[in-house]
Amino acid sequence: MKRATVLALLSATLAKCLVQTGLDVLIASNYSQLAGRKVLVFSNPTGVTPLLHLGVDVMFESGKVNLVGVMGPEHGFRGTVQNGGGESTFVDSKTGLTVYDAYNVNSSVLMEYIRDSGADTVLFDLQDVGVRFYTYIWALYDSMVAAAATDAAFMVVDRPNPITGLDAFGPVLNESFITSYVGRRPIAQVHGMTVGELASMYVGEGWIRDASNGSSLTLTIIKMEGWERSMRFEDTQLPWVLPSPNMPTVDTAMLYGGACMFEGTSLSEGRGTTRPFELLGAPWANESWVQEMRKLDVPKTRYRFQCFTPTTSKFQGTTVCGLQTYMDLRQAGDDDEGFDAPFVGVNLLYTARRLFAAGSTSGEAPTSDSFHWLYSGTSTTYGIDVLTGSPLVREGLESGMTPEQIRESWTPRLQKFREIRKKYLLYH
């Protein structure tokens, strides 16, 4: 009776939604694509139905899917971990399934998970945010490589790109930076694709075959119904579940593709606040930053002076000042086919560096009284270079280039990516 009630409620809810996710389509098919399969699910709290039931729980309770385990990405399967961490492997108390920690591990470790679970199929269901350095699309890539190498089939239950799928923006990852977990292959900083489309690109461009020593992969995309490329997430009428602790709203996701570049600087990118990536600041920043940004008149954005006190991350417990970015998507601009977050981010970096840099502009910790670049972890590679996929943005700013000139410098490779991208688009 309980299962029948859940399915009846789900059917009624789906009728009210403009978009059905791949998970919804899978459930509506009575899991026909999974018949006879031993399924290892890669998911987290975003893998939900419109009724906010976790897909793994729904499949488990249905009794119609042979689940053999779960893999959890950054932040964990049940979403209990902050940025830069995963859960240790454990047994889920609700389902009794082994949950493997799949954050920041290579494909060899994922291969062991597949073998240990006895799976013959990996089912991927994560809500991405449309930005290259968000780690979920590289969890997708690595798990596809592992599936190919172990002869497991791979299925993606597709979900919307929450910041629209209209176009791609920003620099394309340089081949010399493909070892990073925030960039395995040369795609644009804001890619404008769904997870299913990216999976198709990974296979179609030969990247999975190359990374798995020539192994082929049987890939199935369970497509959405009703999604259009111009839709922001709120247009879908689906519930927004935080993909990660610092991604509370769709507006956060829209700005993330530009503002997260401040992670590689001595300024706070707003982590530890209720408005991460909208709020940027430092103890030594002031209202002049807002004044400079207003002079630049960056399309579709507005700015106001704001002070805040981060509860975690940079400047924890210290009051900092800076600005809050607002989007006005009604404004006309030269990026009318989407929101060019990387260009917004470069404008913010340009003004912050010009106003607040003093003396040396490099260092290992955000402790000095000026703007400087931070190294990535324990390496001597700048974090900004890892995030943008090359030294292009940093070196452009250091050489005195304007934001427009920097955007022009990444455009040739971006145009090539846009042409490749067209081959893999599944929706209009």
What are these regions (language model features)?
Residues 1-17:
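Fungal secretory targeting signals
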Residues 226-316:
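Glycine-rich, aromatic-lined ligand/substrate-binding cores of catalytic
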Residues 178-256:
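Conserved anion/nucleotide-ligand pocket segment
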Residues 66-75, 157:
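Short internal beta-strands
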Residues 79-83, 155-178:
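Glycine-rich, charge-decorated loop segments at or immediately adjacent to ligand/cofactor-binding or catalytic sites
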